[in-house]
Protein backbone atom coordinates (compact mmCIF):
# COMPACT_ATOMS: atom_id res chain seq x y z
CA UNK A 1 0.00 0.00 0.00
CA UNK A 2 1.36 3.42 -0.96
CA UNK A 3 2.49 5.70 1.84
CA UNK A 4 1.82 8.80 -0.29
CA UNK A 5 -1.74 10.11 -0.55
CA UNK A 6 -2.47 12.03 -3.74
CA UNK A 7 -5.77 13.51 -2.53
CA UNK A 8 -6.91 15.02 0.76
CA UNK A 9 -8.00 12.39 3.32
CA UNK A 10 -11.28 13.94 4.47
CA UNK A 11 -12.50 13.24 7.98
CA UNK A 12 -9.01 12.28 9.18
CA UNK A 13 -6.36 14.00 11.27
CA UNK A 14 -3.68 15.56 9.07
CA UNK A 15 -0.58 17.07 10.63
CA UNK A 16 1.08 19.94 8.83
CA UNK A 17 4.50 21.42 9.48
CA UNK A 18 3.24 24.96 10.03
CA UNK A 19 5.54 27.95 9.60
CA UNK A 20 2.85 30.62 9.75
CA UNK A 21 3.74 31.83 6.28
CA UNK A 22 1.31 32.26 3.43
CA UNK A 23 1.77 28.78 1.93
CA UNK A 24 1.12 26.74 5.06
CA UNK A 25 -1.58 29.14 6.31
CA UNK A 26 -3.55 28.80 3.08
CA UNK A 27 -2.99 25.04 2.98
CA UNK A 28 -4.21 24.58 6.54
CA UNK A 29 -7.39 26.61 6.03
CA UNK A 30 -8.05 24.91 2.67
CA UNK A 31 -7.75 21.45 4.26
CA UNK A 32 -10.18 22.50 6.99
CA UNK A 33 -12.75 23.70 4.44
CA UNK A 34 -12.37 20.51 2.39
CA UNK A 35 -13.23 18.29 5.35
CA UNK A 36 -9.92 17.20 6.85
CA UNK A 37 -9.01 17.69 10.51
CA UNK A 38 -5.76 19.66 10.41
CA UNK A 39 -3.25 19.74 13.26
CA UNK A 40 -0.42 22.27 13.14
CA UNK A 41 3.13 21.60 14.36
CA UNK A 42 5.69 24.38 14.45
CA UNK A 43 9.39 23.75 15.02
CA UNK A 44 11.28 26.38 16.97
CA UNK A 45 14.64 26.13 15.24
CA UNK A 46 15.84 29.54 16.37
CA UNK A 47 15.29 31.08 12.95
CA UNK A 48 16.98 34.50 12.93
CA UNK A 49 14.12 35.99 10.88
CA UNK A 50 11.34 34.85 13.26
CA UNK A 51 10.66 37.11 16.25
CA UNK A 52 7.42 35.71 17.77
CA UNK A 53 7.16 31.94 17.88
CA UNK A 54 4.34 31.91 20.42
CA UNK A 55 2.02 33.67 17.97
CA UNK A 56 2.37 30.98 15.30
CA UNK A 57 0.25 28.22 16.95
CA UNK A 58 -2.39 30.83 17.79
CA UNK A 59 -2.66 31.74 14.11
CA UNK A 60 -2.98 28.07 13.23
CA UNK A 61 -5.97 27.71 15.54
CA UNK A 62 -7.47 30.84 14.00
CA UNK A 63 -7.11 29.35 10.52
CA UNK A 64 -8.92 26.15 11.53
CA UNK A 65 -6.43 23.79 13.17
CA UNK A 66 -8.00 21.35 15.62
CA UNK A 67 -4.77 21.51 17.59
CA UNK A 68 -1.47 23.38 17.38
CA UNK A 69 1.85 22.77 19.10
CA UNK A 70 5.16 24.60 19.24
CA UNK A 71 8.06 22.14 19.50
CA UNK A 72 11.35 23.55 20.81
CA UNK A 73 13.99 21.89 18.60
CA UNK A 74 16.90 24.21 19.34
CA UNK A 75 18.89 22.04 21.74
CA UNK A 76 18.65 19.01 19.46
CA UNK A 77 19.50 21.13 16.42
CA UNK A 78 22.68 22.45 18.04
CA UNK A 79 23.63 18.97 19.27
CA UNK A 80 23.35 17.58 15.74
CA UNK A 81 25.20 20.60 14.35
CA UNK A 82 28.12 20.05 16.70
CA UNK A 83 28.10 16.33 15.85
CA UNK A 84 28.40 17.27 12.17
CA UNK A 85 31.25 19.65 13.00
CA UNK A 86 33.08 17.00 15.04
CA UNK A 87 32.75 14.59 12.10
CA UNK A 88 33.63 17.12 9.41
CA UNK A 89 30.33 16.15 7.72
CA UNK A 90 30.55 18.79 5.01
CA UNK A 91 31.02 17.63 1.43
CA UNK A 92 30.13 20.78 -0.52
CA UNK A 93 33.04 23.21 -0.92
CA UNK A 94 34.26 25.69 -3.50
CA UNK A 95 37.94 26.66 -3.40
CA UNK A 96 38.14 25.74 0.27
CA UNK A 97 35.00 27.64 1.33
CA UNK A 98 32.56 25.26 3.03
CA UNK A 99 28.79 24.84 3.10
CA UNK A 100 27.97 23.54 6.58
CA UNK A 101 24.91 21.46 5.63
CA UNK A 102 22.74 23.61 7.87
CA UNK A 103 19.48 22.89 6.02
CA UNK A 104 20.01 19.09 5.97
CA UNK A 105 20.76 19.16 9.71
CA UNK A 106 17.60 21.18 10.30
CA UNK A 107 15.52 18.73 8.28
CA UNK A 108 16.88 15.78 10.29
CA UNK A 109 15.73 17.45 13.51
CA UNK A 110 12.40 18.76 12.20
CA UNK A 111 11.50 15.54 10.41
CA UNK A 112 11.99 13.40 13.50
CA UNK A 113 10.78 15.68 16.30
CA UNK A 114 7.59 16.88 14.61
CA UNK A 115 6.53 13.39 13.56
CA UNK A 116 7.22 12.15 17.10
CA UNK A 117 4.91 14.90 18.42
CA UNK A 118 2.25 13.98 15.86
CA UNK A 119 2.46 10.34 16.90
CA UNK A 120 1.81 11.38 20.51
CA UNK A 121 -1.40 13.07 19.33
CA UNK A 122 -2.54 10.11 17.26
CA UNK A 123 -1.83 11.95 14.00
CA UNK A 124 -0.50 9.53 11.38
CA UNK A 125 -0.77 11.67 8.24
CA UNK A 126 1.84 14.35 7.63
CA UNK A 127 2.08 17.21 5.20
CA UNK A 128 4.71 19.89 4.62
CA UNK A 129 5.62 22.49 2.04
CA UNK A 130 8.35 20.66 0.15
CA UNK A 131 8.07 20.44 -3.62
CA UNK A 132 8.64 17.41 -5.80
CA UNK A 133 11.81 18.79 -7.42
CA UNK A 134 13.70 19.50 -4.22
CA UNK A 135 15.69 17.60 -1.60
CA UNK A 136 13.33 18.11 1.33
CA UNK A 137 10.55 15.89 0.01
CA UNK A 138 12.88 12.88 0.29
CA UNK A 139 14.50 13.97 3.55
CA UNK A 140 11.14 14.41 5.30
CA UNK A 141 9.86 11.17 3.79
CA UNK A 142 12.77 9.18 5.19
CA UNK A 143 12.86 10.81 8.63
CA UNK A 144 9.08 10.66 9.06
CA UNK A 145 8.87 6.95 8.28
CA UNK A 146 11.85 6.20 10.52
CA UNK A 147 9.96 7.64 13.49
CA UNK A 148 6.48 6.35 12.60
CA UNK A 149 6.27 3.29 10.32
CA UNK A 150 2.49 3.79 10.05
CA UNK A 151 2.90 7.32 8.70
CA UNK A 152 1.11 8.40 5.53
CA UNK A 153 2.26 11.40 3.55
CA UNK A 154 -0.12 14.03 2.18
CA UNK A 155 1.39 17.10 0.57
CA UNK A 156 -1.00 19.76 -0.73
CA UNK A 157 1.59 20.70 -3.34
CA UNK A 158 1.31 17.20 -4.82
CA UNK A 159 -2.52 17.35 -4.85
CA UNK A 160 -3.77 18.51 -8.25
CA UNK A 161 -7.01 19.83 -6.75
CA UNK A 162 -5.09 22.10 -4.40
CA UNK A 163 -2.79 23.23 -7.21
CA UNK A 164 -5.74 24.03 -9.49
CA UNK A 165 -7.46 26.11 -6.81
CA UNK A 166 -4.47 27.69 -5.04
CA UNK A 167 -1.57 27.26 -7.41
CA UNK A 168 0.26 30.52 -6.70
CA UNK A 169 0.94 33.06 -3.98
CA UNK A 170 -1.51 35.57 -5.44
CA UNK A 171 -4.29 32.97 -5.37
CA UNK A 172 -3.41 31.99 -1.82
CA UNK A 173 -3.45 35.60 -0.64
CA UNK A 174 -6.85 36.20 -2.28
CA UNK A 175 -8.18 32.97 -0.74
CA UNK A 176 -7.16 34.05 2.76
CA UNK A 177 -8.60 37.54 2.29
CA UNK A 178 -11.92 36.14 1.09
CA UNK A 179 -11.98 33.93 4.17
CA UNK A 180 -11.82 37.08 6.31
CA UNK A 181 -8.24 36.83 7.55
CA UNK A 182 -6.98 40.03 5.88
CA UNK A 183 -3.78 38.25 4.96
CA UNK A 184 -1.38 40.68 3.34
CA UNK A 185 1.05 38.95 1.02
CA UNK A 186 4.61 39.99 1.79
CA UNK A 187 6.63 41.62 -0.94
CA UNK A 188 8.31 39.17 -3.26
CA UNK A 189 12.08 38.94 -2.83
CA UNK A 190 14.49 38.20 -5.63
CA UNK A 191 15.20 34.83 -3.97
CA UNK A 192 13.78 32.54 -1.27
CA UNK A 193 15.27 32.10 2.20
CA UNK A 194 15.16 29.21 4.66
CA UNK A 195 16.94 29.45 7.98
CA UNK A 196 17.57 27.99 11.39
CA UNK A 197 19.90 28.74 14.28
CA UNK A 198 22.80 27.04 12.47
CA UNK A 199 22.56 28.95 9.21
CA UNK A 200 20.55 30.40 6.35
CA UNK A 201 19.99 29.28 2.76
CA UNK A 202 19.20 31.72 -0.06
CA UNK A 203 18.23 30.19 -3.39
CA UNK A 204 15.81 30.10 -6.37
CA UNK A 205 14.32 32.89 -8.47
CA UNK A 206 17.04 35.37 -9.46
CA UNK A 207 19.72 33.23 -7.81
CA UNK A 208 19.01 30.44 -10.29
CA UNK A 209 20.98 32.53 -12.78
CA UNK A 210 24.73 32.21 -12.36
CA UNK A 211 24.94 35.77 -13.67
CA UNK A 212 23.46 36.90 -10.33
CA UNK A 213 25.87 36.88 -7.43
CA UNK A 214 26.06 37.22 -3.69
CA UNK A 215 25.61 40.98 -3.93
CA UNK A 216 21.83 40.68 -4.47
CA UNK A 217 21.47 38.89 -1.11
CA UNK A 218 20.59 40.72 2.07
CA UNK A 219 22.22 38.65 4.85
CA UNK A 220 20.04 37.80 7.85
CA UNK A 221 22.79 36.43 10.12
CA UNK A 222 25.58 38.87 9.40
CA UNK A 223 26.68 41.85 7.36
CA UNK A 224 27.10 42.47 3.65
CA UNK A 225 30.89 42.42 3.88
CA UNK A 226 31.30 43.17 0.16
CA UNK A 227 29.82 46.67 0.51
CA UNK A 228 32.26 49.53 0.88
CA UNK A 229 29.87 51.46 3.14
CA UNK A 230 29.77 48.60 5.68
CA UNK A 231 32.48 49.30 8.24
CA UNK A 232 34.00 46.18 9.79
CA UNK A 233 36.78 46.42 12.35
CA UNK A 234 39.21 43.55 12.81
CA UNK A 235 38.44 41.54 15.94
CA UNK A 236 40.37 38.95 17.92
CA UNK A 237 38.36 36.05 19.33
CA UNK A 238 39.35 32.94 21.27
CA UNK A 239 37.53 29.62 20.97
CA UNK A 240 38.07 26.82 23.49
CA UNK A 241 37.21 23.14 23.07
CA UNK A 242 37.19 20.40 25.69
CA UNK A 243 37.00 16.78 24.52
CA UNK A 244 35.56 17.88 21.20
CA UNK A 245 32.89 20.17 22.64
CA UNK A 246 33.04 23.97 22.25
CA UNK A 247 32.85 25.37 25.77
CA UNK A 248 34.07 28.99 25.75
CA UNK A 249 34.27 32.09 23.57
CA UNK A 250 36.61 34.93 24.53
CA UNK A 251 37.14 33.30 27.91
CA UNK A 252 33.42 33.16 28.73
CA UNK A 253 32.23 29.63 29.46
CA UNK A 254 28.80 28.48 28.33
CA UNK A 255 26.87 25.68 30.01
CA UNK A 256 24.19 25.89 27.32
CA UNK A 257 25.32 24.98 23.80
CA UNK A 258 22.44 26.94 22.28
CA UNK A 259 23.64 30.12 23.97
CA UNK A 260 27.21 29.43 22.89
CA UNK A 261 26.19 29.07 19.26
CA UNK A 262 24.06 32.22 19.43
CA UNK A 263 27.10 34.13 20.66
CA UNK A 264 29.28 32.52 17.98
CA UNK A 265 26.71 33.67 15.42
CA UNK A 266 26.91 37.22 16.74
CA UNK A 267 30.71 37.26 16.63
CA UNK A 268 31.03 35.71 13.19
CA UNK A 269 28.08 37.66 11.86
CA UNK A 270 29.79 40.98 12.61
CA UNK A 271 32.29 40.06 9.89
CA UNK A 272 30.14 38.17 7.40
CA UNK A 273 32.09 35.02 8.25
CA UNK A 274 30.78 31.74 6.84
CA UNK A 275 29.02 33.04 3.73
CA UNK A 276 29.52 30.96 0.60
CA UNK A 277 28.21 30.61 -2.95
CA UNK A 278 27.92 26.96 -3.96
CA UNK A 279 26.85 24.88 -6.97
CA UNK A 280 25.75 21.48 -5.71
CA UNK A 281 24.14 18.24 -6.84
CA UNK A 282 20.68 17.63 -5.42
CA UNK A 283 19.63 14.14 -4.38
CA UNK A 284 18.10 13.60 -7.83
CA UNK A 285 21.49 14.62 -9.34
CA UNK A 286 20.25 17.87 -10.89
CA UNK A 287 22.52 20.80 -10.11
CA UNK A 288 21.30 23.72 -8.04
CA UNK A 289 22.88 26.86 -6.63
CA UNK A 290 22.65 28.36 -3.17
CA UNK A 291 24.18 31.17 -1.16
CA UNK A 292 24.67 30.22 2.46
CA UNK A 293 25.31 31.81 5.84
CA UNK A 294 26.69 30.05 8.92
CA UNK A 295 28.76 32.53 10.96
CA UNK A 296 28.83 30.58 14.22
CA UNK A 297 29.62 27.18 12.77
CA UNK A 298 32.30 28.71 10.58
CA UNK A 299 33.98 30.26 13.62
CA UNK A 300 33.90 27.00 15.58
CA UNK A 301 35.09 25.02 12.56
CA UNK A 302 38.20 27.17 12.09
CA UNK A 303 39.25 26.47 15.67
CA UNK A 304 38.29 22.80 15.56
CA UNK A 305 40.18 22.10 12.33
CA UNK A 306 43.25 23.91 13.66
CA UNK A 307 43.29 21.65 16.70
CA UNK A 308 42.67 18.55 14.57
CA UNK A 309 45.76 19.27 12.48
CA UNK A 310 47.89 20.01 15.55
CA UNK A 311 46.84 16.92 17.49
CA UNK A 312 46.24 14.03 15.08
CA UNK A 313 48.63 12.28 12.70
CA UNK A 314 48.40 12.39 8.91
CA UNK A 315 46.60 9.09 8.39
CA UNK A 316 43.99 9.92 11.04
CA UNK A 317 43.38 13.32 9.45
CA UNK A 318 43.08 11.70 6.01
CA UNK A 319 40.49 9.21 7.32
CA UNK A 320 38.61 11.99 9.13
CA UNK A 321 38.38 14.03 5.92
CA UNK A 322 37.41 11.11 3.68
CA UNK A 323 34.78 9.86 6.12
CA UNK A 324 33.55 13.42 6.65
CA UNK A 325 32.88 13.91 2.96
CA UNK A 326 31.00 10.63 2.78
CA UNK A 327 29.05 11.45 5.93
CA UNK A 328 28.23 14.91 4.59
CA UNK A 329 26.70 13.35 1.50
CA UNK A 330 24.62 10.95 3.62
CA UNK A 331 23.44 13.88 5.73
CA UNK A 332 22.51 15.81 2.59
CA UNK A 333 20.51 12.81 1.34
CA UNK A 334 18.43 12.56 4.51
CA UNK A 335 20.35 9.56 5.89
CA UNK A 336 21.79 11.14 9.05
CA UNK A 337 20.34 8.38 11.23
CA UNK A 338 21.07 5.47 8.88
CA UNK A 339 23.46 2.79 10.22
CA UNK A 340 26.29 3.70 7.84
CA UNK A 341 26.06 7.35 8.94
CA UNK A 342 25.99 6.46 12.63
CA UNK A 343 29.10 4.31 12.12
CA UNK A 344 31.00 7.20 10.51
CA UNK A 345 29.79 9.70 13.13
CA UNK A 346 30.69 7.52 16.09
CA UNK A 347 34.15 6.84 14.71
CA UNK A 348 34.93 10.54 14.33
CA UNK A 349 33.38 11.57 17.64
CA UNK A 350 35.21 8.85 19.56
CA UNK A 351 38.64 8.78 17.95
CA UNK A 352 39.01 12.30 16.56
CA UNK A 353 36.85 14.67 18.59
CA UNK A 354 37.59 13.40 22.09
CA UNK A 355 41.24 14.39 21.75
CA UNK A 356 40.31 17.93 20.72
CA UNK A 357 41.03 20.02 23.79
CA UNK A 358 42.60 23.45 23.49
CA UNK A 359 42.17 27.11 22.64
CA UNK A 360 42.65 28.94 19.36
CA UNK A 361 42.90 32.70 18.92
CA UNK A 362 41.64 34.03 15.59
CA UNK A 363 41.62 37.48 14.05
CA UNK A 364 38.46 38.02 12.00
CA UNK A 365 38.37 40.67 9.30
CA UNK A 366 35.90 40.83 6.36
CA UNK A 367 33.96 37.84 5.12
CA UNK A 368 36.05 34.68 5.25
CA UNK A 369 39.29 36.63 5.68
CA UNK A 370 40.92 35.63 8.96
CA UNK A 371 44.26 34.74 10.55
CA UNK A 372 45.05 32.23 13.26
CA UNK A 373 47.11 34.00 15.92
CA UNK A 374 47.79 31.25 18.45
CA UNK A 375 47.07 27.58 19.13
CA UNK A 376 47.26 25.99 22.58
CA UNK A 377 46.48 22.41 23.61
CA UNK A 378 47.84 19.90 26.12
CA UNK A 379 47.38 17.27 23.39
CA UNK A 380 49.46 18.88 20.65
CA UNK A 381 51.84 16.52 18.87
CA UNK A 382 53.37 19.53 17.13
CA UNK A 383 56.91 19.70 18.55
CA UNK A 384 59.06 22.20 16.61
CA UNK A 385 62.27 21.09 18.31
CA UNK A 386 62.08 17.85 16.34
CA UNK A 387 62.67 19.73 13.09
CA UNK A 388 64.60 22.78 14.29
CA UNK A 389 67.47 23.90 12.05
CA UNK A 390 69.29 25.11 15.14
CA UNK A 391 71.79 22.91 16.99
CA UNK A 392 69.52 21.12 19.43
CA UNK A 393 69.12 17.62 20.76
CA UNK A 394 67.47 15.71 17.93
CA UNK A 395 65.41 12.55 17.81
CA UNK A 396 67.46 11.38 14.81
CA UNK A 397 70.91 12.05 13.36
CA UNK A 398 72.22 12.83 9.85
CA UNK A 399 73.36 9.21 9.57
CA UNK A 400 69.82 8.05 10.41
CA UNK A 401 68.46 10.17 7.56
CA UNK A 402 71.06 8.75 5.16
CA UNK A 403 69.78 5.28 5.98
CA UNK A 404 66.17 6.35 5.52
CA UNK A 405 66.92 7.88 2.11
CA UNK A 406 68.85 4.79 1.05
CA UNK A 407 65.75 2.70 1.69
CA UNK A 408 63.92 4.86 -0.87
CA UNK A 409 66.16 3.49 -3.65
CA UNK A 410 63.90 0.47 -4.09
CA UNK A 411 60.74 2.40 -4.87
CA UNK A 412 62.65 4.93 -7.01
CA UNK A 413 63.99 2.02 -9.08
CA UNK A 414 60.49 0.59 -9.31
CA UNK A 415 59.11 3.93 -10.53
CA UNK A 416 61.87 4.24 -13.14
CA UNK A 417 61.08 0.74 -14.43
CA UNK A 418 57.37 1.52 -14.68
CA UNK A 419 58.06 4.70 -16.65
CA UNK A 420 60.13 2.65 -19.09
CA UNK A 421 57.23 0.21 -19.51
CA UNK A 422 54.84 3.10 -20.19
CA UNK A 423 57.22 4.39 -22.86
CA UNK A 424 57.41 0.96 -24.50
CA UNK A 425 53.62 0.70 -24.82
CA UNK A 426 53.35 4.23 -26.22
CA UNK A 427 51.82 6.04 -23.24
CA UNK A 428 54.93 8.19 -22.74
CA UNK A 429 57.51 9.66 -25.07
CA UNK A 430 61.14 10.40 -24.14
CA UNK A 431 61.69 14.01 -23.10
CA UNK A 432 63.81 16.22 -25.34
CA UNK A 433 65.34 18.31 -22.55
CA UNK A 434 64.80 16.03 -19.59
CA UNK A 435 65.71 12.53 -18.57
CA UNK A 436 62.06 12.06 -17.64
CA UNK A 437 59.57 10.89 -20.27
CA UNK A 438 56.66 13.12 -21.27
CA UNK A 439 52.96 12.28 -21.35
CA UNK A 440 51.67 12.01 -24.91
CA UNK A 441 48.71 14.18 -25.88
CA UNK A 442 45.72 12.89 -27.86
CA UNK A 443 47.02 14.69 -30.95
CA UNK A 444 50.51 13.20 -30.76
CA UNK A 445 51.34 10.61 -33.40
Swiss-Prot record:
Binding annotation for L-aspartate: 131, 135-136
Catalytic reactions of this protein: L-citrulline + L-aspartate + ATP = 2-(N(omega)-L-arginino)succinate + AMP + diphosphate + H(+)
Predominant location: cytoplasm
Keywords from the UniProt entry: Amino-acid biosynthesis, Arginine biosynthesis, ATP-binding, Cytoplasm, Ligase, Nucleotide-binding
Residues that hold ATP according to the record: 17-25, 43, 129, 131, 136, 194
Subcellular location: Cytoplasm
InterPro entries, sorted: Arg_succ_synth_type2_subfam (IPR023437), Arginosuc_syn_C (IPR048268), Arginosuc_syn_N (IPR048267), Arginosuc_synth (IPR001518), Arginosuc_synth_CS (IPR018223), Arginosuc_synth_type_1_subfam (IPR023434), AS_cat/multimer_dom_body (IPR024074), AS_multimer_C_tail (IPR024073)
Keyword Amino-acid biosynthesis: yes
One term under GO cellular component: cytoplasm
Pathway in which this enzyme or protein is active: Amino-acid biosynthesis; L-arginine biosynthesis; L-arginine from L-ornithine and carbamoyl phosphate: step 2/3
EC main group: ligase
Binding site for L-citrulline: 99, 135, 139, 192, 201, 203, 280
Pfam families reported in the protein's UniProt record: Arginosuc_syn_C (PF20979), Arginosuc_synth (PF00764)
Enzyme nomenclature, EC number: 6.3.4.5
GO biological process, one term: L-arginine biosynthetic process
GO MF terms, alphabetically ordered: argininosuccinate synthase activity; ATP binding; protein homodimerization activity
UniProt subunit comment: Homotetramer.
Similarity annotation: Belongs to the argininosuccinate synthase family. Type 2 subfamily.
HAMAP family: Arg_succ_synth_type2 (MF_00581)
Protein name: Argininosuccinate synthase
Biological classification of the source: Bacteria, Pseudomonadati, Pseudomonadota, Betaproteobacteria, Burkholderiales
Gene: argG
